[in-house]
Amino acid sequence: MPFTFALTHSDVSLRLLRMRDWKRIEAIQLEHRDWFRPWEATNPGGPMNFDFRSLVRNSLRQLGDESALPLAIEYQGQFVGQLTVSNILNGSASTAFIGYWISPEVAGKGITPIAVALATDYMFKVVGLHRIEIDIRPENKASLRVVEKLGFRFEGTKKGFIHINNAWRDHSVFALTAEEVPNGLLKKFLKD
């Protein structure tokens, strides 16, 4: 199924990532390196690649083969972060993973929970997936608060799951199924 995308709630919007977004991604990521460093994946075999143009190009390639849905998070019309639905599997697995980052300039404004809820609802209602998983470092209190607010359930720990900040790091696993939010995650979040 080809993805078409433009979702909005209040001041928060999700849209497909565009090639030209690499400049804004680069500006945010490099300006706030210390903010992102504890959570960003690193290369276990060498230096980190800060070629944001190539990263966006690769994300758009994955969009083309429908294995990922790279989205820009906008707040009041400005690019402030990215949310990616990745490892999209249809058929008997019918699952995907969500990862996200947001500029520290707007962190704490409730943008990320709304963005995750919008993306989750789209994947459940439009794409027809059954399960969404979010993996988070246990030390990432802000991200843990996002899944807590949205009602994702804790399922366990993946030991040494992703190479981050020069070491293999454990991640806590959180998931939600479509049956748990029959009226939509955003509606449930706003109601709670």
Which residue ranges define each predicted feature?
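Acyl-donor (CoA/ACP) binding surface of acyl/acetyltransferases
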Residues: 1-24, 28-35, 70-192
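A short helix-loop-beta-strand connector motif used in the catalytic cores of GNAT acetyltransferases and
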Residues: 44-45, 57-72
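Short, charged low-complexity intrinsically disordered segments located at boundaries
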Residues: 51-62, 86-90, 151
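Conserved GNAT-fold acetyl-CoA-binding loop/helix
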Residues: 37-57
